[in-house]
From Swiss-Prot:
The name this protein goes by in its record: B3 domain-containing protein Os03g0212300
DNA-binding region: 13-110, 158-265
Chief site of localization: nucleus
Keyword Repeat: yes
Keyword Membrane recorded: no
Length: 270
């Protein structure tokens, strides 16, 4: 019963990993917090599935580093990464589905969700030199359109420019149109940004444009940037942590975004 309750706590647990230059190609470290939540349970094998993929999951071994105590995805990870063409700078969102299964969503260097169907179409136009490469292409091709909208609209990424980091009175960050429409930002007055265990309340500024209403992070955004030492070239990843209840009114709802940052030098904040 205790193991079942622990599994319930972990179900839908999400974390991200960034493929950094020089990182190991044969293993991927799992976040300390996730490993801690596993507790004494031994997770020896995981099943990875790209979001929307219809075929069987990929089997990947899980191991502990006896010296550091860190937990890694090991044997099988390199094959998964190669089949899905994971490269430096790619941003991976893992969702734990329970029973050692993970759903993985991949965002590439354009900060957009990767469309594996398009890559497969290009691969099919060429010839396959071995059964291994054919199998890998077939696995990549199974990514389908199911669920793409929900996942894609639950998060967005922005690389900071000078206009996002000007003096306190002029500082702002525009929210992508599709994201703000999906979460009804026109009816909201504020959002809460969470990072590194802390929270910042940011007021929203709405303005009318030819293509419709535009929403930007405004008052409170400056404090968030200063407190976290953000600079031009840093990339911020925003993900909906809690939607908030609009029925209580825009001023009273608690719409929460989880923020992670990839600094221009390759280090990360989360």
């Amino acid at each position: 019963m205790e193991d079942q309750m622990a599994n319930l706590r972990l179900t839908d647990f999400e974390f991200f990993r960034i493929i950094l230059p020089g990182s190991s190609k044969t293993k991927l470290k799992l976040p300390y917090k996730f490993a801690r939540e596993l507790g004494d349970r031994e997770l020896r094998e995981a099943r990875l599935r790209v979001a929307g993929e219809g075929r069987r999951p990929w089997d990947v071994k899980v191991f502990d580093d006896d010296v550091s105590g860190d937990v890694y995805l090991g044997r099988g990870w390199q094959e998964f990464a190669r089949a899905h063409d994971l490269r430096d700078g790619h941003f991976l969102v893992f969702r734990y589905d329970g029973a050692a299964a993970f759903t993985v969503t991949v965002f590439d260097e354009t900060m957009c969700r990767r469309d594996y169907r398009r890559h497969h179409d290009a691969a099919e136009s060429g010839s396959s030199s071995s059964s291994d490469s054919s199998d890998a292409a077939a696995a990549v091709a199974t990514a389908a359109a199911e669920g793409v909208g929900d996942v894609a609209l639950s998060q967005f990424a922005v690389t900071l420019r000078q206009c996002n980091l000007e003096d306190k009175q002029a500082q702002y960050l525009n929210v992508p149109m599709e994201f703000q429409e999906a979460h009804e930002y026109a009816r909201r007055e504020k959002v809460v940004l969470r990072m590194r265990g802390e929270a910042w309340t940011v007021r929203l500024k709405h303005s009318r444009r030819e293509r419709g209403q535009r929403t930007a992070f405004r008052y409170g955004w400056h404090r968030f940037c200063v407190d976290n030492g953000l600079a031009v070239g840093d990339t911020c990843f925003f993900r909906v942590l809690r939607e908030g209840d609009l029925r209580r009114g825009g001023a009273a709802d608690d719409h929460v975004l989880k923020v992670a940052v990839r600094k221009a030098d390759g280090t990360t904040l989360e």
